[in-house]
């Protein structure tokens, strides 16, 4: 018997989740839910339905786990509690400062529906956090550093695009080279997460 999975949101994350499901024989993609016209969404999995988000409640007893693939800025704070009342849910909410608030909202909704809500299990927080935990367990007297970039931040870019009047936007994260070198040289500097920001039109 396979675990029936629903995907809500079919952008880069949703497509990646579909590929992961296809690699696990005990999982089956039941449906993808989208805000777009379902006729325009082409998925890889034969036999899986593509439905409008508005139709999700009709799948309440047909899906074991709903994986929410929206953005942390505005999608997941609303979607995860809403759908935790109907399904077991998983999200990758990554606004670190708001995780306790998000947990409280999802926990209450999941309990109301008799479901399980698992939040913030993307990369960071998520798999990357576990890697850091393992390293700290093995080297308890060590000092760990986290550098992001060089690269595009999907979450920050999503937040930028949701600002009224912004047609498109990308946020690039570039670590401070002097900080990288200090760590590489074994200087164990005290660093903060504050960085400089610039905008280019």
Where are the predicted features?
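General beta-strand structural signal in soluble alpha/beta enzymes
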Residues: 91-92, 117-121, 147, 170-171
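Rossmann-fold NAD(P) dinucleotide-binding segment
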Residues: 56-61, 65, 73-92
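Hydrophobic/small residue at the entry helix of a nucleotide-binding pocket
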Residues: 13
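Rossmann-fold NAD(P)-binding glycine/threonine-rich loop
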Residues: 93-117
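NAD(P)-binding Rossmann-fold cofactor-contacting core
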Residues: 23-45
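Active-site-lining helix/loop region of Rossmann-like oxidoreductase modules
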Residues: 8, 16, 136-201
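Extreme N-terminal starter segment of soluble prokaryotic enzymes
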Residues: 1-5
């Amino acid at each position: 018997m396979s675990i029936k999975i629903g995907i809500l949101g079919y952008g880069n994350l949703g497509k990646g989740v579909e590929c992961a499901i296809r690699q696990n024989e005990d999982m089956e993609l039941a449906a993808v839910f989208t805000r777009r016209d379902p006729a325009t969404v082409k998925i890889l999995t034969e036999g899986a339905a593509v439905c409008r988000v508005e139709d999700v409640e009709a799948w309440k007893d047909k899906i074991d786990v709903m994986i929410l693939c929206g953005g942390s800025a505005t999608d997941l704070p609303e979607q995860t509690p809403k759908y935790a009342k109907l399904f077991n849910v998983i999200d990758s909410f990554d606004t670190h400062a708001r995780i306790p608030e998000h947990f409280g909202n999802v926990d209450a909704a999941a309990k109301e529906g008799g479901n399980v809500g698992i939040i913030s299990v993307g990369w960071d927080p998520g798999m990357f956090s576990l890697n850091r935990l393992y390293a700290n367990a093995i080297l308890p007297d060590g000092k760990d550093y986290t550098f992001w970039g060089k690269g595009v931040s999907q979450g920050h870019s999503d937040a930028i695009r949701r600002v009224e009047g912004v047609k498109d936007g990308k946020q690039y994260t570039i670590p401070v080279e002097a900080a990288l070198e200090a760590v590489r040289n074994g200087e164990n500097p005290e660093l903060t997460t504050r960085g400089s920001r610039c905008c280019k039109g």
